[in-house]
Regions:
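Short histidine-centered catalytic/ligand-binding loop motif
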Residues: 118-132
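Intrinsic-disorder/low-complexity, polar/charged segments enriched in Ser/Thr/Lys/Arg/Asp/Glu/Gln
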Residues: 109-113, 158, 172-174, 186-188, ...
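Long amphipathic N-terminal alpha/beta scaffold segment
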Residues: 39-121
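HotDog/MaoC-like acyl-thioester-processing domains
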Residues: 2-70, 74, 167-169, 180-230
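Residue-level recognition of well-ordered beta-strand positions that form the cores
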Residues: 115-117, 160-162, 176-178, 192, ...
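Hydrophobic beta-strand-centered segment that forms part of the acyl-chain substrate-binding groove
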Residues: 141-174
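Active-site helix/loop of acyl-thioester processing domains in fatty-acid/polyketide metabolism
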Residues: 103-107, 132-151
Length: 230
């Protein structure tokens, strides 16, 4: 096992905990209205925390020479890239974070499921989620759909969103994505966002459709991503 793999494995729990605290801090800064003394005290604490984090920059998977990558490090790079992703990364304080899994829908069809709860720091319209954030979550969840049919690496050719009603904050949201059509290198997937209703049911707040294009094998050769990064 490489030194990098050992180091990142050892720091992961602390990194996840730190990101949770920063995420909560962002929500508190957005929510609270303290006096100037409290603001100055908080600023000093944050400045001290930033000073404590002074260290060399973390290398991304694409910055690591192939000659340095063994099997253990490849696994670690994959995990590390996921940990820092914009929407589902547990170590990225900007991530909600989104929890992604696979399952089946009511018809028994395979789906990618994204579960998330958005607080007031993600607000767009009054007491509702920002539409751009909803679109970004759709993009992330839909990116898993090609793997349901073993389509291999793909790139997004088009993403369209239809907003049916405002998406509420501070509730458990569920995103579902499925493949609806595949022809040659092209694949179409659709998704929906479900929010709970007061009567115990759910309603669709937005829908999305994405066109993916498979990457030709010749384009993959010599450019494999050891971390499966998006």
């Amino acid at each position: 096992m490489s030194d990098r793999s050992r180091d990142t494995a050892a720091t992961r729990p602390a990194g996840l905990g730190l990101a949770d605290e920063v995420r909560a801090l962002i929500a508190d800064v957005n929510r609270s209205s303290p006096d100037v003394d409290a603001l100055e005290a908080a600023r000093a604490h944050v400045a001290a925390a930033r000073a404590a984090l002074e260290s060399p920059d973390r290398r991304r998977w694409y910055e690591v020479p192939v000659s340095e990558i063994d099997d253990d490090l490849a696994v670690r790079l994959r995990e590390e890239t996921g940990d820092h992703s914009l929407y589902r990364g547990g170590r990225n304080p900007l991530a909600p974070p989104l929890r992604v899994s696979t399952g089946v829908d009511s018809d028994g069809e395979p789906v990618v499921v994204g579960e998330v709860r958005l607080d007031r720091s993600r607000e767009g319209p009054p007491a509702r989620a920002h539409g751009g954030l909803v679109a970004g979550i759709f993009d992330d969840v839909l990116s898993g759909a090609p793997w349901l049919v073993d389509a291999g690496p793909v790139v997004t050719g088009r993403l369209s969103i239809r907003y049916r009603r405002p998406t509420p904050l501070d509730v458990d949201l569920r995103f579902e994505a499925r493949v609806v059509r595949q022809s040659g290198r092209r694949l179409v997937a659709r998704a929906r966002c479900l929010a709970p209703t007061t009567d115990g049911g759910t309603e669709v707040t937005a829908e999305a459709e994405a066109l993916f294009v498979a990457i030709p094998r010749r384009a993959q050769e010599g450019a494999d991503d050891p971390a499966d990064g998006a």
